[in-house]
């Protein structure tokens, strides 16, 4: 085999998987789709297996108020929360007690605790990411509902990677925090390209960003 032939084989060997990934992205990346599919008013949650990520504090409060307004009778629920966030866990458990149903709970280790140095947080961040990756691979929800905390970003991208690899078909629904009136949060900006549905609560945001949905204030 001469040098030119060997070079052609090498280029083809490298380029083929890259091309396959790019084609796959064209099919699954929501930001590359035309927004016609979100012009019609749709139910936020339909009958499915739903995962709900609780981000602690105000994010958990907003999420619980949103959930309380949805018809969840035919929805199988799994709650994802940060390890040690007992307040969020208690709110989810209280909701399930009032609903008279049972559900699953998945704790995700914190990537970084308050006051922890950035250097010492490297191993804990890696551990949190790997734990989340394994947990999501086992769980593979039909729909995951997120609303803004930084914790949701790695979880969403892990699920998107699994979609890219054909391991799941999770629909990612992101609801921007009510506090965001004129500009999306950093989490929102990061998740806008990969979210199947992206919902804002202020018309000013709806006018600024393509692909977003607006149904008024949800909480």
Curated annotation (Swiss-Prot):
Single GO MF descriptor: protein-membrane adaptor activity
Topology within the bilayer: Single-pass membrane protein
Lumenal compartment spans: 1-8
A single cellular component GO annotation: nuclear membrane
GO biological process per UniProt: dolichol-linked oligosaccharide biosynthetic process
Transmembrane segments: 9-29
Subcellular location: Endoplasmic reticulum membrane; Nucleus membrane
Side of membrane Cytoplasmic, spans: 30-219
Main location (coarse class): endoplasmic reticulum
Gene3D superfamilies named among the record's database cross-references: Glycogen Phosphorylase B (3.40.50.2000)
Keywords: Endoplasmic reticulum, Membrane, Nucleus, Transmembrane, Transmembrane helix
Family: Belongs to the ALG14 family.
Function: Involved in protein N-glycosylation. Essential for the second step of the dolichol-linked oligosaccharide pathway. Anchors the catalytic subunit ALG13 to the ER.
PANTHER family: GLYCOSYL TRANSFERASE-RELATED (PTHR12154), UDP-N-ACETYLGLUCOSAMINE TRANSFERASE SUBUNIT ALG14 HOMOLOG (PTHR12154:SF4)
Subunit-level organization: Heterodimer with ALG13 to form a functional enzyme.
Protein name: UDP-N-acetylglucosamine transferase subunit ALG14
Annotated organism of origin: Candida albicans (strain SC5314 / ATCC MYA-2876) (Yeast)
């Amino acid at each position: 085999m001469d040098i030119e032939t060997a070079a052609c084989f090498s280029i083809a060997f490298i380029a083929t998987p890259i091309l396959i990934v790019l084609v796959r992205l064209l099919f699954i990346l929501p930001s590359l789709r035309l927004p016609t599919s979100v012009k019609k008013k749709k139910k936020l949650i339909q009958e499915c297996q739903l995962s709900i990520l609780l981000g602690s504090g105000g994010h958990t409060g907003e999420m619980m108020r949103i959930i309380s307004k949805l018809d969840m009778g035919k929805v199988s629920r799994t709650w994802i929360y940060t390890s040690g966030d007992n307040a969020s866990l208690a709110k989810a458990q209280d909701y399930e007690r009032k609903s008279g149903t049972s559900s699953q709970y998945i704790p995700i280790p914190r990537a970084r605790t308050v006051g922890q140095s950035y250097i010492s947080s490297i191993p804990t961040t890696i551990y949190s990411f790997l734990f989340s990756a394994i947990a999501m691979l086992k769980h593979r929800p039909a729909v995951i509902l997120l609303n803004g905390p930084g914790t949701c970003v790695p979880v969403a991208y892990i699920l998107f990677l699994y979609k890219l690899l054909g391991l799941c078909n999770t629909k990612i629904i992101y609801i921007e925090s009510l506090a965001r009136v004129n500009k999306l949060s950093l989490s929102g900006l990061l998740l806008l390209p990969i979210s199947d549905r992206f919902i804002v609560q202020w018309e000013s945001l709806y006018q600024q960003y393509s692909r977003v949905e607006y149904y008024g204030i949800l909480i």
